[in-house]
From Swiss-Prot:
GO terms for cellular component: cytoplasm. InterPro entries: DUF167, YggU-like_sf. SMART domains: DUF167. It comes from Nostoc punctiforme (strain ATCC 29133 / PCC 73102). HAMAP family: UPF0235 (MF_00634). Pfam families: DUF167. Belongs to the UPF0235 family. This is UPF0235 protein Npun_R3528. Residues 1-23 are annotated as: Disordered.
Length: 75
């Protein structure tokens, strides 16, 4: 499964909002430095979709706020 994700680093609280178009807006506490925000994003998405962190990959947008995430789910 692939999801478009818009990341908002340096937020006061962590939360995930699903948009009407199916994309996600993810608010992260971590700053976008040294991959910390990406690590936090993967942890949050793994918890939300109930998968291992290793099942989530950032396909594009590694250094951008707009990302394409791939989630491997065994359903």
């Amino acid at each position: 499964m692939q999801k478009k994700v818009k990341v908002k680093p340096n937020s006061k609280q962590q939360k995930i909002e699903e948009q009407p178009d199916g994309s996600l807006t993810v608010y992260l506490k971590s700053p976008p430095v040294d991959g910390k925000a990406n690590e936090e994003l993967i942890k949050l998405l793994a918890k939300k979709f109930d998968v291992a962190k290793s099942d989530i990959r950032i396909k594009s947008g590694l250094s951008s706020r707009q990302k394409l995430i791939e989630i491997d789910r065994d359903v």
